[in-house]
């Protein structure tokens, strides 16, 4: 069959953002209505290829060196020399997508350090429901084959349907990366390609944690527990996790490469990924014993210690309960006591699944909430608590805890409280590796809302954080894709502040909140408003004679001040203030001020108009000096935020981002002339809006002429 190039259609710009928000409100991005990645529709593309008799070739992830990588696997790397992209039909006469179901033997690592991803894929094979959410049914190299396949992945809060062609990297007729033990089975290699596509290249997959893959295949959130420092109620946590259908895995750390696959005295394998499949309390000789059931997915090597298959401990258990627990010999699954589990294993991972991943009606679901946010230098990237001058500008999210955990969940005798998990994930960092950007160091802190602010959607300011310690926080700030921590706090309102470790580190993030009981959440942001003094417009007769004399001297014969004259006047004035760091008012800045203050539309300022501008500038100068805290002659972007609020303006995060982008220097300093221009524009625009908002509903309607008049001359 001939090959035909299919070009994807991309949505860009503001319209794409609006479309995305609307579509999300309608349910787009949920698993049952996954987003078509890069706008590629699998069914349409496949039908087109079948109709035209061509095999699909994906120009969004083409078979070229750049798709392999950028450094170790870059275009000129020795590791990629001789790589040829071939279809399975060119390698085998009878290639298969899946043979006799997906199993762990379908996944063998190739020349890529993505064992973390392959371990996650292997774990998927233990759960058919989850597997076929990622690997949709009905794909093959026989019926309706068109060289096109698709997979569904969770990406930062949304499910995406990813289309790939089946051109795979080969050397000497063999797959370079993941392959099956049988050789002719290709679902795992094609899934790896789909994952490489969303991350920009195969090389971007090098290095990671299994939990990252787990989350992208389930949409869940992972908790980590070091078993040497296990919380007293860990067994209760495991019971509840299993009850909710969570995926649990554990392992024994290795101290060197030589320990890999080493078998302990009691037949546990180091460096291996074990699944936790059950937990049960049994009555043993009159005492309740906590047991945990394990599965070794890699083989039949089983634990031989207490409570293992055929051990004497089972003789002390009621036969009916023993039969219920289905103790069998040599099936890769075994029981052990929870005490031995803590002693023998090193690490436990719990991947909590979202409600849409759980089809069973028997499991108890988490309540989940997801927020997307950004850190932008100068406006919302304040760094951690170590930087008190800027920490407060970070995005803030409120949690309202109302219902305490069920009494039967209070294993270990702790005081009642509300359990929840917070997970902070940074977005798109793998994809940005080719540009030299790697994971930022991230974390979060949790603060209790003071009584006087309960129920108010107020973005907490600097003074609050200077006076109050955090109530809880992430266990560490670390350069991983996600940081997650389980908390248990009394009912009340709390504010979560996610941040990078250092200020001015930019990035996008997702903050997820998983609660045992229903809880209220909201993003905190200031409401846009201005508290402006009544504008005193004096008549010419009321203006001070000294000011009139000054004006006549400055304005010249026409008794009006032009843009150039205003620039000369203002720069002469500020040159006398040696404490101000400024390059002087630009012609464009002065034109802006004239356009905004010019009431009769002649492009010049008369006596009254200049008097209003003059008084404003004097007021702005006093504010500028007040908030130039280090007396540097300029304000930082963060000082400017406080100064703007002092001038009577409350703005939200997005507006501050725009202002800092527009009015700050590359080093985020704001000089006096830019500060004045910003405030003049803000005040005039607020007053303009207030004049048009006659019914005070916060909405005005423009015709095209008014809109152009406002935007072209503002």
From Swiss-Prot:
CDD domains: Calpain_III, CysPc, EFh_PEF_CAPN1. Its cofactor is Ca(2+). GO terms for cellular component: cytoplasm; cytosol; plasma membrane. Binds 4 Ca(2+) ions. Coiled coil: none annotated. Its EC number is 3.4.22.52. Activated by micromolar concentrations of calcium and inhibited by calpastatin. Residues 355-526 are annotated as: Domain III. Ca(2+) 1 binds at residues 109, 114. It catalyses: Broad endopeptidase specificity. Ca(2+) 3 binds at residues 598, 600, 602, 604, 609. The record marks 15-16, 27-28 as: Cleavage. Calcium-regulated non-lysosomal thiol-protease which catalyzes limited proteolysis of substrates involved in cytoskeletal remodeling and signal transduction. Proteolytically cleaves CTBP1. Cleaves and activates caspase-7 (CASP7). This is Calpain-1 catalytic subunit.
